[in-house]
Amino acid sequence: MISFTLSLIALLLGYFLYGRFVESVFKPDSRPTPAIAKADGVDFMVLPGWKIFMIQFLNIAGTGPIFGAIMGAKFGPAAYLWIVFGCIFAGAVHDYLSGMLSVRHGGVGLPELVGYYLGDNTKKVMLVFTVLLLVMVGAVFVYSPSIILGDLTHWNVMLWVAVIFIYYIIATMMPIDKIIGRIYPLFAFSLIFMAVALLACLFVKMPNLPELWDGLENRNPAAGPIFPCLFITIACGAISGFHATQSPLMARCMKHEKQGRPIFYGAMITEGMVALVWASVSAYFFYDGGAEEVGSTLKASAPQVVTAVSNSWLGTFGGVLALLGVVAAPITSGDTALRSARLIVSEFLHFDQKPIAKRLMICIPLFVVTSLLLWFNIANEDGFNVIWNYFGWANQTLAVFTLWTLTVYLVRQKKPYIITLIPALFMTTVCGTFLAVSPIAFGLSTTVSYIIAVVVFLFSLGWFVRWYSTQK
């Protein structure tokens, strides 16, 4: 429990110390925000700061800080280090600066920002890449909550699939304050309750968790080498490119720029804490007899761990409330993913989104593609894993593009660009190595993949040095 407690304290200190430093680098000011300058009553409108935080937290959470942390815990105590350092120095910086850059550029989406700083050709690639990623999120986050709801209610799973998909359609189309602004705080309460309740259980039980000084060796070699596989497995709890597609939604609702640190940096730190709690619960589950206590096996899947631990530790009512939080996380990420896709396409096509007819013109093709991926997910026994594995790599690759965009911005503004350059180089190397070593890609040996990692790192650094020399 010592490593876990120190990790929690480190995340809190990271928000108050490093978060304040990153804010001072950006220098928020009193200029009008997009919510005021471009108010349209649909996507651009002022919302209360606490509500924006709740929505941002749910938008970025998904199942990543829960399922990802559970799967990542199997690697051992190294998961603690990645969650803490990744969250403070990479993920929260990525989320804050991408959100604030969107504010400064009128609330535009990620492809527009990438195009402005990395060029029009990169923007076109990013547009297709981002929309496909968001549609994958929509498809993946329909079926998994339907299974949990089916178990809770004993209703047919396909009925829940239909209900959630219909909700996606409505939430994607409606003004942001009509549905998302009203029900998200309730969903966020369930998710936060789950994390706080499990945190309390950990301190009451005081289990003998693996500590950092026990060694950082890979305790789950079947999942691949710690580098890069741990850094892809635990994404949303440390850094996630998907977040940069969600931050512009809230950038369009902020009253003033000073709200940025608690909303963007703070939501990421909160997500890191959720990931840390689940990684610790899972470490107890896998390594200290927790599996026997809740009546499950060491090889249980992430959803099985969630269900078993929630019901056993929190009782019937608490377990149901906790599971509702787990259900709310993917549903609320799925609907805002499709909403982001609509807005990104509308920006590219210059479609005014106030008339509902023009919203429909974009939404219908998006829903058709999402439904096809959903059908593949359901019809194939391994469909979820196939989509999820590609999503995991695509998600971190998106973070790479965002970090390089932020680095170019900081260089041009003559600000300390090192805060994004180091994460950009690291994540570029992670994604390149994963592409080499992963069975879903080239499946090369670890030795060859690490040689490729060195080449990717040196090439990326060389590209940056060459580009930087042209900026003086």
Predicted features, each with a name:
Residues 1-19, 72-102, 111, 319, ...:
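Extracellular loop-to-transmembrane helix junctions
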Residues 10-66, 259:
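Membrane-interface "cap" regions at the ends of multi-pass membrane proteins
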Residues 138-142, 146-161, 170-172, 191-218, ...:
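Hydrophobic alpha-helical segments and their helix-loop junctions in multi-pass secondary transporters
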